[in-house]
Amino acid sequence: MLLPRCCWGRWLMGRRPRCSCQAPAGFDGKDGRGSRVREKPPWRVLFLGTDHFARETLRALHAARDGKEEKLIEKLEVVTVPSLSPKGLPVKQYAIQSQLPVYEWPDVGSGEYDVGVVASFGRLLSEALILKFPYGILNVHPSCLPRWRGPAPIIHTVLHGDTVTGVTIMQIRPKRFDIGPILQQETIPVPPKSTSKELEAVLSKLGANMLISVLKNLPESLNNGRPQPAEGVTYAPKVSAGTSCVKWEEQTSEQVLRLHLAIGDIVPLQTLWMENTVKLLDLVEVNNSILADPKLTGQTVTPGFVVYHRPSQMLLVRCKDGWIGVRSVMLKKTLTATDFYNGYLHAWYQKNSHAHPSQCRFQTLRLPTKMQQKTKLLLCNSALSS
């Protein structure tokens, strides 16, 4: 079990900083529409989200609404975004199955709420919308802010080889993403060789539990909110489809493997074999016993050089430094490494018997700029749900 710990130490102990959030009520204890502001649960909540990460948060809110022991949520309604899928995004699917009222952005309904909750929503919220909620809008963000602000924090956590990550519950500010005060923050170690999808599953449960904890003591949590540090700010922009094209001459074997772990569940890494696009489906680290093979030592080979290693039944591809193993690929159909050798590599060697072996290589696939913009398969957290 991964045990979370506080990201920010004990500096806040014994202190009760001035609340940097929107005041929960006017002097008369009423919100802008004349309704009396609640000072304790149960809360009326509007949830805005899209993907599997967000669905876990919605599930926790739903369970809190229907809880018999302690009534934390009185009212729960949902906002999601349009989807090309007929079934809709995971949040919409869950809302419909659970018979929760659901709206499609920019429609947010016309009901009265105490607090808004956002998770993986990907839309900037206006100040006018934020001010409709007496307690503002909370964001469940899967990173330790201010590291990895933006729409793809989990992907960038894996892509950059972070060993520690976490979840931040923050209060939203208008006009910019992920800059508001931190209400709660916890860290966990990143499991070795974890994919973005696997890490998302861990963080989604942590974030859902943290949100429920904040809602149980909402006024106090808001009052104890702290500004994000000015140091350590990094950004997690969406990742374009072109990122999936392996640059053998520029990327190390570790970088290629991290790229596969980060986006391989969403879009496979791609390369070029004799002018044909090849998708690399199953990439693995090459162990020392394989690297000791005489075929791989004592000769200089060009990055992209590919050879079939019969004992391990893998394709071995040379990177900028070192080798990466490939167990399966896709051309017109999915092929094992052995299938690829029998159907393509062996035929190349027969046809080019006098060529230097280093000419048998994968080359970097370069997508036209227009194609990248057209497909704009921009990868963010919500893409993990597709």
UniProtKB/Swiss-Prot annotation:
GO biological process, one term: conversion of methionyl-tRNA to N-formyl-methionyl-tRNA
GO molecular function: methionyl-tRNA formyltransferase activity
EC numbers: 2.1.2.9
Alphabetized UniProt keyword annotations: Mitochondrion, Protein biosynthesis, Transferase, Transit peptide
Keyword Protein biosynthesis: yes
Locations listed in the record: Mitochondrion
Catalytic activity line of the entry: L-methionyl-tRNA(fMet) + (6R)-10-formyltetrahydrofolate = N-formyl-L-methionyl-tRNA(fMet) + (6S)-5,6,7,8-tetrahydrofolate + H(+)
Coiled-coil residue spans: none
UniProt superkingdom: Eukaryota
InterPro entries in UniProt: Fmt (IPR005794), Formyl_trans_C (IPR005793), Formyl_transf_N (IPR002376), Formyl_transf_N_sf (IPR036477), Met-tRNA-FMT_N (IPR041711)
Entry GO terms, CC: mitochondrion
Keyword Mitochondrion belongs to the record: yes
Domains (record comment): Composed of an N- and a C-terminal domain. The N-terminal domain carries the tetrahydrofolate (THF)-binding site and the C-terminal domain is presumably involved in positioning the Met-tRNA substrate for the formylation reaction.
The family this protein is said to belong to: Belongs to the Fmt family.
PANTHER family: METHIONYL-TRNA FORMYLTRANSFERASE, METHIONYL-TRNA FORMYLTRANSFERASE, MITOCHONDRIAL
UniProt function note: Methionyl-tRNA formyltransferase that formylates methionyl-tRNA in mitochondria and is crucial for translation initiation.
Identification of the protein by name: Methionyl-tRNA formyltransferase, mitochondrial
Annotated organism of origin: Mus musculus (Mouse)
Lineage: Eukaryota, Metazoa, Chordata, Craniata, Vertebrata
Name of encoding gene: Mtfmt
